[in-house]
Every structure is written in C-alpha cells, then in structure tokens.
C-alpha cells in the first residue's frame, strides 16, 4: 500500500513512518522539515512542502492509497495547522480521488456519551480548550466529507 503521512517529523509521525515501513508499505513523508528523517529506506520518499499549499498537497497525495494525518501544532489555539491543514488535505484528497484517511485527534473529541463530546463537559480543563477546539474543527471537516475515515 502507498501511504502519505502528514506530520511525519513530529513525535507521533516519526513512529508512524517507521511502523508503516516496517510493515512493508511505501511511504511518502510530507512536511517542512523532512530532511530530519533518515532517507535510507528505498520505500521512503521525503516530500518537503507546506501544509497550506494546495498544489503541493495535491501532488503529494496523488497516487496514494491512503492518507495518515498526525498533524501537530501549538496548544494556544492561534495555530490553525490542525483545522485548516485538515481542510486542505480533505479538499486535495477529493481532487486526487483518494478516499481513505486515518487521522489523529485529541482527547476532547472523544465521546463522553452518545451525544456529547468530552470537550463539551463543564469540567473539561480550560487550558486545553483552544487546542481541543482545533481538533474539533479538523474532526468536523472529516465528518462533512464523503471520505472513508
């Protein structure tokens, strides 16, 4: 299977790339700082690009069987990488006719019960609301899509 990993140079992304390669998948690692990754595996392709660049993201996704998003960012809510990055990924996946995505989200978007998310609970930690809301927005882009997630 040919995979692309967004957020490939983060703590989680590095492990996702390693595991995917170990399992025999061809992997495209996408990010601003992909030079940090060791390019010793012939099944690994490093793609330097910006998450918000529509053309770069489209070109990277094209020809893949699935997308993995482990995008990170700051916790203050000012960094919109999670939400706007997911919006661009979803848009470019549709254009490239790639339907399968696995995306990492934060604890706030886990269900408290059938109709309520943890982030909507009164006792949800206030310091995590900004990043939690970023995860929620990213999740909403996935929910609104016709992708297989």
Model-based region annotation:
Residues 74-101, 130-137:
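NAD(P)-cofactor binding segment of oxidoreductase domains
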Residues 6, 30, 70-71, 101-106:
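SDR active-site strand-loop-helix element
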Residues 35-43:
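Short loop/helix-cap segments at secondary-structure boundaries that form the rim of catalytic
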Residues 3-25:
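N-terminal Rossmann NAD(P)H-binding glycine-rich loop of SDR-like oxidoreductase domains
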Residues 76, 108-113:
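Conserved catalytic-site region of short-chain dehydrogenase/reductase
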Residues 42-65:
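Conserved Rossmann-fold cofactor-binding substructure of NAD(P)-dependent oxidoreductases
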Residues 30-35, 50-51:
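N-terminal Rossmann-fold cofactor-binding loop
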Residues 140-149:
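Conserved beta-loop-beta element that borders a ligand/cofactor-binding pocket
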């Amino acid at each position: 299977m040919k995979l692309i990993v967004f957020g490939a140079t983060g703590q989680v992304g590095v492990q996702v790339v390693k595991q995917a390669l170990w399992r025999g998948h061809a992997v495209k690692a996408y990010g601003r700082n992909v030079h940090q990754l060791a390019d010793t595996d012939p099944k690994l392709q490093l793609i330097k690009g910006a998450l918000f660049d529509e053309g770069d993201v489209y070109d990277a996704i094209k020809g893949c069987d699935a997308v993995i998003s482990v995008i990170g960012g700051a916790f203050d809510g000012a960094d919109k990488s999670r939400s706007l990055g997911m919006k661009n990924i979803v848009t470019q996946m549709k254009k490239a006719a790639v339907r399968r995505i696995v995306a990492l989200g934060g604890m706030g978007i886990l269900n408290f019960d059938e109709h309520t998310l943890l982030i909507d609970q009164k006792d949800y930690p206030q310091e995590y609301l900004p990043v939690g809301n970023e995860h929620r927005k990213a999740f909403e882009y996935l929910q609104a899509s016709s992708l297989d997630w």
